[in-house]
Every structure is written in C-alpha cells, then in structure tokens.
C-alpha cells in the first residue's frame, strides 16, 4: 500500500510552473503586444479575461494525457496526413508540441527578465527569477547560466543533464523529462537565445491550444453525427456526408474508410427514416464562437444528453449552466451572430439555436428563434464605414491608408473583400442588396487609385476598368467574373430550411452554401 500511495503521490504531483496563471498572463500579453493600444493601462478586467482563456484546466488535462501515454518525439514537422482515423488523430503529436512550446516559453521569460523595459507588459511583477523557478533557490550556484540567460553555454552533457535534474526535483515525472531530453537532444539550437527569439513569433501557446480544441470539438461533433447516421452512412457515404457539411468535410472524406456500396433506394429510405428520428443538425462556427441549428426529431435529445453535454463537461471542464438574467434580457430582442440576424419570432417548426462562447463557460438555449435569411445590409454598411470605405450613408470614399500599396495590391484587397462578402451572404433572400455592397467597394477602389495617382475618377476608370471591372451580378449569372467567384449560388432558389456549409477563405471561415 505504501508503494501504491507513493506512486499515486508522484502521479498527482503539483506542477507549479505550469499552473502559475500569472506566468501565462505574462506570456499571453507578450504575444498580444501589438494588439494592446495602451500598454501602461492594463485593466484588471482584461487580466481576468485573459486568465479565463489560459485556464489551468487545459494544462492539467495536458499533463494527465502525458502520463497516460508513451510519446515518441519524431522531430519538428507538420502533422502527418496519412492517418485514416479522423477522431483525435493528432493527439500524440499535439502533446509533444505542447511540451516543447511550454518549455520554450519558460526559457523566453527567463531571457527577457534581465531586459526589462519601461511599460513592458511581459513583466507584470518585477521579482527575482525564482518566482518562475522556486526550486532554483537551493541550487543557485549551479544555475548561474539560466539566470543570466546563457543557456547556450551548456557544452557538456553533465551541464545539460543537470538542468533536467533540477526540473525533476520539482516535477518528478520521468516520462515528461525524458521527452524533454529527446526534444532538446535532437534540436539543441532551441536552447540558444538568438535562435529562439527569431522563432518566437511562430510559437503562440494560446493560439495553439485554441486551434486544437476547436478542431477537436469539430471532430467530436462529426464523429457522433456520423455515428448517429450510421446506417445511411454505410449505404451511401458520399451522400450522407454531403447532407451535413462541416468545417473539415474535405479532410473527413479523405480520412474515412468508406465502403463503396451503391444502393440508392435503400439510402433514400434510410435518410428519410433517420431524419424523422434524429432531425437535421446544422453546425456553424467562426473563430471562437459556434452555433448549432437543429430541426429536432423524435430522438434528438439523445444526441445532446449523452454526447455534446458530456463532452463539454468531461473533456473541456466547462460547466453547462443557464444564465437566466442574460436570457431574459436577450430573449425579447433580435441580435446578430456571425453576421446573420437571429429573429425573435415563433416558428411553426421545432427549430432551436444553441450558441456557445469559448470565452465564457455558459451554454445558451434559445427557443422559438430562427435565423433570418435576410442580409443585414445596414450593419454591413456600418462595418464598411468603420473600415473607412464609405460613410454612414453608404457613400464610397477613398482609403488613404491603402494608397501606399501598389496598384495590383489595392485591386486584390478590394477584390478579395468583395469575394468574401459574396460567398458569405450568397444564400440570402435579399441577395439583390449585394449590389449596394458591390457599388461601395467598386467606387471605393477607384477613388483609392485616383487618390494615389492624384487623378480624376473618370480617367482612373478608363485606365483600370479592364482590371477592376466588378461586373454586375446579372452578367455573372452563368459565368465567373474577375473576382473568381462562382456566382451560381447567388441565383439559386431560396429554401425555407437551409444549411450553412463552411469553407476556408484565406484566414477566415465563411458560410457560402444553403441547401434544403
């Protein structure tokens, strides 16, 4: 019993270095240095908000998974794309990268301790470096290289192993430290300050955590919906997947071992029966917010009761609760979500919308709501006015900040902006109002070019109309325009019940397909 209790004590050892939330606040503020307008006036509310993002439960889960598995470090490379399973397939590789990134962030904090600057947000508490490494006080003589940032002086294996001996005194996890040794033995240049400072902008712990959990949640949703529609999926995999499209549909189609069976009649019967039992689940996510629209069937509650809610509680550690005061204040008014208007209007069909914000551990249940198929034109014009592309009345103006670019870059910026808007709102019932947005972007582009060359709009139009001709939507009905957008979707018949299909457009996610 003593051996077992001692073993459990080692497994449940406290990791003060990784649970130190002040350390993660410092790291995250340093990574978001460019996004902070007033560095000296960091409010306490912002620190609390950052603290919620980098919650220690994520690191606790990381450590728990490290102890359960045996990891093999295969060098710094991209995720393998030859695996067949899509459900948590990058799990082992993720934890290897996490260990590397966490340790490098620790080293970076040490190196910058002696380089304090005025109003440096990276250092909120000016204390000794022992605040990050409390166990170094016992071996301070042997850790002079670490304190002065001269870790590159570890020329011998004895000095290199001594660093991990100090870590082991506090962490007491052999598998964790062995993995660290393998990482730095294969890439010892990671211990050099110059190399690390050059690569630091590529290593963002919070963004890496956030993207992984988003992909993990997407995989979880897809996995259980495919499991729910198992019969229809086995009969006709391609049609079953196309009936509910998700963020990683292309990856799913490549990774799943599909059984090639062509039984169209049975597939049609299976789809009809399963839709009547489980309903339709439409999943939309952009950045850290996601939305699920459900046309509930007879047994749709099983999916939520035993899958999604359990996943949020056990995997992410988020308590599933209701904010009654927030619901009462929001229920009687319309609001925008992901660029679409959520209308407070009772619908005949049993249609529910559930929205979750990753910044707050609350799930909101909205009953009797529906997604409006009309594009919020005035809100979109307001956003364009914030970007200084037009005024509040929708009159186009020039963008002086973009006049420093060359002509090709200016045209590409406006072309990509119009392309993204067309794709995102292509299924709206008032898609004819897209002509207003097209007009604003077209003349704003011309005015920007005229402002750059100090010429009139007429002469600028004559010179650049071959390159920046945003043709009318009517002329582009059956063919692509200069913006390389398939405008066929703009003229499809608007359905009463539609599905938002997601596609990656540059760095953002856009919904561009609406099907029944």
From Swiss-Prot:
Pfam family example for this protein? MatK_N
Signal sequence extent: none
Q: Is the keyword Lipid metabolism assigned to this protein? A: no
GO CC annotations, alphabetized: chloroplast
Classify the main location.
plastid
Matching HAMAP family? MatK
Name used for this protein in its record? Maturase K
Organism, per UniProt? Chara connivens
Lineage, highest ranks first: Eukaryota, Viridiplantae, Streptophyta, Charophyceae, Charales
Q: Which gene encodes it?
A: matK
